[in-house]
Amino acid sequence: MKIRAVQIDIARQMETLDYIKHFIDFTSSSGYNTLVLYLEGRIRTNTFPFMAENESYTPEEMKEVVDYADRKKMDVIPVVSNFAHTEQFLCFKETVRFGELREGRTGRFGNNISTVCPSKEETYEFFENYYREIADIFPSPYFHIGNDEVWDIGFCSLCRNRIKEGETEADIFVKHLKRTYNIVAGKLGKKMMMWDDMFEYYPEALEKIPRDIIMCCWHYDTFIDIPKTHFGNRKRFDPLATYDKLGFKYLIAPREIHPENVITLTEYALNYKPLGGLLTIWEKGTDFMLEDYPNIAFAGKLWERSTVDNPDDLYKGVCKKIFGLTNSAFLDLLFSIKYYGRWHINKFLRGPLTPCEHIRMKLVAFFEKQIKPFEKKVKGSIGKEIFRDILLRLRIERLHLNMRSFFSSICKYISGRKEIHPDILISEGTRILQEIDIVKGIRSAQWKRFRPGIFPVKTDTLYTEIYREIEGILKEIQSGRILRRGVFYIRYFLPDPYGSQKVRIAIKYKGEKKWNDLYSGIPKPDIDDPSQIPYYTFTHFVSGFKVPEKILFQTYGYGGIGITFLEIVNKKGHFIPARTDRTSGKVSNPDALLIDDTRWTYLGEINTVRMYQDHKKGEEIHSIEISLSRV
């Protein structure tokens, strides 16, 4: 492939210049010829001088990075979005006036002020000046304008007036792209790149924009034959065929987490004429990139040879070079670990332990036991550092699964579904707290080494929060207060796990007139757990000594959400749905949730695209009130 690019996200998590240079050393020797810097507003300039010195880079510092990359024969492309993902620009009193939600309106997915208004002339004046300053730093022929996930088009009074006068959101998007193109291509003489996901919502826009805009086609599903849309109904479609037909050039953009994502997206792309590949790496605030270096090197080498033949052998060859070992058992083991993927540690209160998690617990223990003996055999300082980070990732995975198991045991203990002595739970919780302390210490040491002087220390924040959560639960077990709780189980049907339906659950107890709020938020499943799809169980605590009489379930937002069953277990008994009392809004098959089977009650619109295109539909509340009875 002509362009073999790798992106580092220094907008969400700053890195030191030394680390960026180290990353350039590694990637330039791994087949890459381009470094993409995801910046947002991280560079402090005359136009945008508001970022604190310790939270931003100077133009001179970035020029130092560009010069270093040039010596390694790597081009450096900046990414500065001028539509969505502009929160770094909009968080200052001098610039907040550029925001689309500046008048206090709520956007599609909340009040996050991250989108600029495309109807204000000063928006373009600001970005033209800032883009000119950024372009002076980066001599690359390319300039990436972001423009992904622009959820809030048409919300401010100026934009609403344009829509009232006959323009569509797609028209506004097209005019914005043309204005930006006139700046980037017309005035700065750069080739404009952009993310392509918004054309899933506004497909008619593609035929109205300049054909020399380069599309960056990002897809992160582990296995891809034909890509799916990112949010709207996850429709299967063929974007590269469309780009070839219309005459656009494009890059494919997988993510670093899983090699199979890189392989299958590349395999799909090689049926067409990609300009290259861009491996995206996003925020690493609570971890580091080291553990992903084998995946990163693999993608670079894969694109360097432009074929997906024998990817397993290529991956093992990359690992031979990194770790200096040719032992086949080691290479097979490392290959299995990296293909195994990873989960995030901050979802341990989500629901009961799943079948997939049970299996992963066994696998993690096996991986740790088998790979640990190779630690002293790994050669080279970089190889040793990467190996230690992989070991740490396995340890964190084990910690996460132990916390998940701990929470599941607590729910069984409270509900009486399993006889567990509290001393066993106390012992398990104490071991988890000790392990959290150890992991936090290791991460803190890594931070001091790789990110000296960069604050806040997000790893400390994460593990401190988790420690306090576990510690609080442990104190309840020790005092016996945990038995004052009951357990509420709700099983969702979520055909689109990327949906964003906001949910409110309230409970009314016998003899009480007031609804008690139980949960408010978006029930996001772990999309990497195939043992649940599309049914996901979530758990909440309720009163242990009151008789639950009714459940109120409300939802609003873009799309819909299904419920297959719900139940409560506490000291007063086991309670399940008896009847549906009333519904409002759009509720399909309201009686389906009365029986614990595969059917579902659906609240909202199953066509998320239709709701996305109508602001008012996203504000509609859909609700169902359910009476409970004791089994």
Q: For each predicted feature, which ranges?
A:
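Substrate-binding groove of N-acetylhexosamine-processing glycoside hydrolases
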Residues: 21, 25, 64-67, 73, ...
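Short beta-strand-plus-loop segments that form exposed binding edges in beta-rich domains
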Residues: 553-559
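Feature activates predominantly on carbohydrate-active enzymes
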Residues: 1-175, 179-189, 193, 252
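Extracellular carbohydrate recognition and processing domains
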Residues: 497-500, 510-545, 585-593
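Extracellular beta-strand elements of beta-rich domains used
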Residues: 566-568
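Exposed beta-strand face motif in extracellular beta-rich ectodomains
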Residues: 547-551
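Activation corresponds to long, low-complexity, non-globular regions
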Residues: 483-488, 497-504, 519-521, 573-630
